[in-house]
């Protein structure tokens, strides 16, 4: 069994309660009949997502058969209230397929609150502090074979959240993080709700961190960076430019703070 995607991303930012629907396909690549004993949402009835299979909506479907070479559409709907203070920045669930003792998963991600979302994109200019910023994948200030010599300036009081495996990447460009004593800039994970056994803020390695490659002159001031894989990594090679750190606190990184 295979699916047309391993992650379904609902990248609509809601300003009022709303819903949207996306779909993917499930394929039977084998010569025999594929028997899906169950297809369900990991969060079950607690999920904001709903699945539609063959015109029926629900959170659990059982005993589905696909003929050899056949496929089926699976529609997924999510309803989000961005004003719900208990929602995480990124609302995640999974569709779990059980077939002949094997498990296959498709991850579901939707924006849970009103924020600036940077999804695998080139970034420059100014990041304001009026809403949180969420990095999903790579937010790149310059990128090999695409762009360089750019500048990203981050205002005092800005909060930046990194999704799992996400990175702020600075390639032959400048990063200016302008925190102050009373309004520091904070980089941290996007998961703010606690895990079952641990507070969310105690778990390291929840996002990749800030990575500089041959940076132009950059500065980071009055900033906290926490719970990354590596807080700040600087690959200068033959570049004589500097990254100036002033009143920067880096803690709880998985491998190294700096």
What do the PLM-derived regions correspond to, one by one?
Residues 2-12, 17-18, 23, 56-258:
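Beta-strand/loop edge motif enriched in small/polar residues
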Residues 26-33:
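Asparagine-centered strand-capping/turn motif at beta-strand->loop junctions
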Residues 28, 40-43, 99, 189:
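Residue-level signal for short segments within beta-strands and strand-turn junctions
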Residues 35-38:
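Short flexible loop/turn segments that cap and initiate beta-strands
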Residues 40-60:
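Short, solvent-exposed loop/linker segments at beta-strand-coil boundaries, enriched for Pro/Gly
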């Amino acid at each position: 069994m295979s699916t047309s995607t391993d992650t379904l991303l609902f990248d609509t930012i809601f300003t009022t309660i709303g819903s949207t629907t996306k779909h993917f396909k499930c394929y039977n690549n084998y010569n025999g009949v594929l028997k899906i004993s169950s297809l369900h949402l990991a969060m079950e009835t607690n999920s904001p997502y709903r699945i539609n299979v063959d015109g029926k909506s629900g959170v659990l479907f059982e005993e589905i058969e696909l003929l050899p070479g056949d496929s089926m559409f699976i529609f997924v709907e999510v309803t989000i209230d961005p004003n719900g203070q208990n929602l995480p920045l990124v609302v995640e669930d999974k569709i779990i397929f059980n077939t002949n003792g094997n498990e296959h998963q498709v991850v579901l991600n939707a924006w849970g609150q009103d924020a600036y979302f940077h999804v695998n994109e080139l970034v420059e200019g100014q990041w304001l502090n009026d809403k949180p910023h969420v990095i999903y994948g790579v937010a790149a200030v310059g990128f090999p074979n695409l762009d360089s010599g750019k500048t990203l300036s981050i205002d005092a009081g800005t909060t930046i959240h990194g999704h799992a495996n996400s990175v702020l990447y600075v390639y032959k460009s400048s990063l200016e993080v302008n925190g102050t004593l009373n309004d520091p800039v904070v980089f941290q994970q996007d998961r703010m709700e606690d895990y079952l056994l641990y507070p969310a803020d105690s778990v390291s390695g929840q996002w990749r961190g800030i990575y500089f490659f041959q940076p132009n002159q950059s500065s980071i001031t009055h900033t906290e960076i926490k719970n990354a894989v590596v807080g700040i990594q600087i690959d200068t090679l033959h570049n004589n430019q500097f990254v100036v750190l002033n009143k920067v606190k880096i803690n709880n990184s998985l491998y190294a703070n700096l």
